[in-house]
Amino acid sequence: MQLLTLPTLIFIFLNYGTPCLSLRILVYSPRMIPSHVAFVANIANLLGQRGHNVVVVDNVLRSDISNKLDLKVIEKVVKVETSANVAKLLADQSIPINFWSMRNEPEEQKKVMKQLGIIFLEQCKYLVSKEETVFNELKHLEFDFGIHEVFDICGIGIFEKLGIRKSVILSSTGMRDIVNEALGISSQLQDASILSDYGNSIPFYGIRRNLKFHSAWRNFFEVQSKTLEPLFETTSSFENLLRFSNLMFLNTHELADAHRPWSRRVHEIGGISFKFPMPLKNEYINLFNKYNSIILVSFGTTTPSFLMPEKYKNTLINTFQRFPDFLFIWKYEKDDEFTQKNKKGNVVFKKFLPQVDLLESRKIKLFITHGGQNSLLETFHSNTRTLITPLFGDQHRNAQIALENGLSHVLLKDQLANEELVYAAIKQGTESNKKLDDNLLKLSSNLKNAKQTSENLFLDTVESTYTDNLSPLNFEFYPKLYSSDQILLYLDSIAMFTLTLLTMILIRKFLL
């Protein structure tokens, strides 16, 4: 009998063996913040390319951005159109305007996160009202597990309504406060809130302030959950339902993030969303031929530059003109009076930037950025220097961590009004600094194969967890922690009791 050759065996395994391992997966993807959408879509596409049956609930909060899904490998997309209430809430652009004007204090983060929470809540309520569109299409399918990012928490209710208890939590940033708290991974007294401006550690005098940042995220979660739990008719709170999750994957890298307590069911996959750079178009090549030093300026898609306060715009343009030998390429999303007035000289305005292509060209001397997680990882991968101006959310923490890890300089948002401070920051960011360059080179080298490594880690972990395993381990028996609100109440009660006691002692001693 003739033995099968090695190529024949490989062909049989790839074409007939893989389907035996095929899993049916439900992915919940709210279309709201582009970087989050891209991260979740990348995971869905990866699983589809692997041969798994992937169904995506595409909950469209913003129709102006793509869902980033590869329809050639996705089995089914259940699309939920934008709620009229959500369209109305987003139309006035009050949220990005607030991002530009707010201070990074717990009360202000709480206020703007509540605005976001209400938008997610309204869209989820609309989704629930579309019973026939969503649940009737999905209830006849048997899913092995679900995948969602616990930012918009509608996915928790969808999974519970469909009887999906096994799930994977994603985070396109670092670990989210409420998730860490709900799963019992580590205490809020130890961990800097993702909304805070603390890095690897919290100073003693900052403990209460950090707890208030944690409380702001809890409020964002509860703005949604308090209404959605009865709407989905869940038998347990959304917070408790999170504990049935089996795995969590974070868009972080150990050399670029803070050190913190960990769990064996939590994995870092920073770099999994890296894109392959394309050759630069002639317009950029021609620009680069005119200048030896190029500075890229972009504050992300959620906080467009045209909504920036005028005083910041004027400071930046005046400062840029003080560097005549540098070309500044500024992502500015519309033509307006400001761009018309400042088109001359060494500043070029672009509504869209091929950011990865520009960074990987090795022509960029400095990237002035808002410090979003994806942007930072892409920049570190390209070994490009950054000047971070954090605006909202996790960006303040990202900036502080990068500063503490010797990877970047930081220019605070309110400093954008001071031309001398902006000038000094750009000068510092472009001057010789061997320690900074060595740190960036080390991180860049470690990120070189991060995409492939992260993809392999994700696929191997997910497949080993859910293939032929009816009861994979979860977070159900992890310790239950006090909430940030409870700890704040205890601390404030102790402080009030102590103050009252001291007051009584002083009164008795000096007045009686």
Curated annotation (Swiss-Prot):
What's one GO MF term for it? glucuronosyltransferase activity
EC class, as a word, reads transferase
Q: What does the record give as the reaction this protein catalyses? A: glucuronate acceptor + UDP-alpha-D-glucuronate = acceptor beta-D-glucuronoside + UDP + H(+)
Does the record carry Transmembrane helix as a key word?
A: yes
Q: Where is the signal peptide?
A: 1-22
Span-the-membrane segments of this chain are 487-507
EC number(s) stated in the UniProt entry for this protein:
2.4.1.17
**Gene Ontology cellular-component annotations:** membrane
Which InterPro entries has this protein been placed in?
A: UDP-glycosyltransferase, UDP_glucos_trans, UDP_glycos_trans_CS
Bilayer disposition of the protein: Single-pass membrane protein
Give one Pfam family: UDPGT
Q: Does the keyword Mitochondrion apply?
A: no
* Location(s), subcellular: Membrane
Primary site of residence:
membrane
- PROSITE patterns linked: UDPGT (PS00375)
Provide this UniProt record's keywords sorted from A to Z. Glycosyltransferase, Membrane, Signal, Transferase, Transmembrane, Transmembrane helix
Q: Which PANTHER family match?
A: EG:EG0003.4 PROTEIN-RELATED, UDP-GLUCURONOSYLTRANSFERASE UGT-55-RELATED
Family according to the record: Belongs to the UDP-glycosyltransferase family.
Q: What protein is this chain from?
A: Putative UDP-glucuronosyltransferase ugt-55
Upper taxonomic lineage:
Eukaryota, Metazoa, Ecdysozoa, Nematoda, Chromadorea
Gene name of the encoded protein: ugt-55
